[in-house]
């Protein structure tokens, strides 16, 4: 334990610390500003879905869970910025806050992937309903839809549990005595001293593990999103051509799908690209990010990563015409000349929801 403590105190120190106080101060204000905007963006989706009673709709629930995760993540970013004061000496608090942040952003990765998967399975169900009169393997799809949100929450907890336990056992939070202690993720020193020990320690292993699981979940998410959007595009062409006619409105929807194929992964990469570069360089060649390049990526990361809640609410929520019009699409007997039987309502609602999924993609 003492050996690890001695090595930790020599690692990740800045020189001279006071020269970079302005950099950390800039990052703090960027992080807090973008976190507040993300809170407003994610909160707007949550409030709209709750007040319009849309949370239980199968195409809205994934977006609601993603927005809820984005809201919690933005709150943690905001807390990190508020804790960035010279008088704050709770180093363990900052370390554990970073673990919470890592758990939340990995959960947001999985919820993003789950959202895109739900869009694809909805379109797939519509295709088989058109061919056979009923969706293919509806029971299995329904079970996967229930299991997806649970796994999206549990997997990040399981992946970050070793970081929490080992980090507190070996007191890795002594690294947070430096002025960047509570800011963002991957907050290694801007400059390393010549006395920094390259010796492999428990804390350095934990740091590399954190970066590895971040890179792994990032790649899984962006590759999965690209695959599902590509499959959705080809599936939509099959849905339309099965009717024997491919009109102008179908081409418009197909072009919309193609734009979404680019937009969804691009928005995700925009949020986490700088963090991806920082993590990769810190794993492969840490010397590269010392100095001005590290500062630039660090400031850029504060702008993009903390803006995820704002960007997601625009890309997946308010820019979607179908999402904005869902409040008026509920089944009401009073508005029909031929009232629906109570037993027919679930089937009608399911068909109406599936038929509108192409507008929601």
From Swiss-Prot:
<feature type="transmembrane region" description="Helical">
    <location>
        <begin position="210"/>
        <end position="230"/>
    </location>
</feature>
<feature type="transmembrane region" description="Helical">
    <location>
        <begin position="261"/>
        <end position="281"/>
    </location>
</feature>
<keyword id="KW-0812">Transmembrane</keyword>
<dbReference type="GO" id="GO:0004930">
    <property type="term" value="F:G protein-coupled receptor activity"/>
</dbReference>
<dbReference type="InterPro" id="IPR022343">
    <property type="entry name" value="GCR1-cAMP_receptor"/>
</dbReference>
<feature type="transmembrane region" description="Helical">
    <location>
        <begin position="64"/>
        <end position="84"/>
    </location>
</feature>
<feature type="transmembrane region" description="Helical">
    <location>
        <begin position="29"/>
        <end position="49"/>
    </location>
</feature>
<protein>
    <recommendedName>
        <fullName>Transmembrane protein 116</fullName>
    </recommendedName>
</protein>
<feature type="transmembrane region" description="Helical">
    <location>
        <begin position="147"/>
        <end position="167"/>
    </location>
</feature>
<feature type="transmembrane region" description="Helical">
    <location>
        <begin position="103"/>
        <end position="123"/>
    </location>
</feature>
<dbReference type="GO" id="GO:0005886">
    <property type="term" value="C:plasma membrane"/>
</dbReference>
<feature type="transmembrane region" description="Helical">
    <location>
        <begin position="295"/>
        <end position="315"/>
    </location>
</feature>
<keyword id="KW-0472">Membrane</keyword>
<dbReference type="GO" id="GO:0007189">
    <property type="term" value="P:adenylate cyclase-activating G protein-coupled receptor signaling pathway"/>
</dbReference>
<keyword id="KW-1133">Transmembrane helix</keyword>
